[in-house]
Amino acid sequence: MKRFDVWLIMKNPEYGRVVDNLGLCTIITPNELNSLPSLLVAPMTTSIEKIPSRVECIFEGANGFIMIDQIRTIDKFSFIKKLGELENDVQINLCDRFQEFFAY
């Protein structure tokens, strides 16, 4: 598990494994902290319009968004399957957007 990997996760594991409970996310935790039992992730979606707190991406041929306004911490047991990694240009754009989002 490393930064910018895209994973299928269980959103709410306490409610069981149902299809509606699954989602895509990208890991945003710096690799130096990935030994911890939980990771910081940003959910991914194909169904939300473009707004400033969303980063556009194409993953597995689908246009979508990374929702940096919906970041959350997920226990590692909620990670089901690694699906790939974000393209380099999306990684750069995501980091730039985080700097803007959390600017003081």
Residues covered by each model-derived region:
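Conserved functional hotspots at enzyme active or ligand-binding sites that engage polyanionic ligands
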Residues: M1-Y104
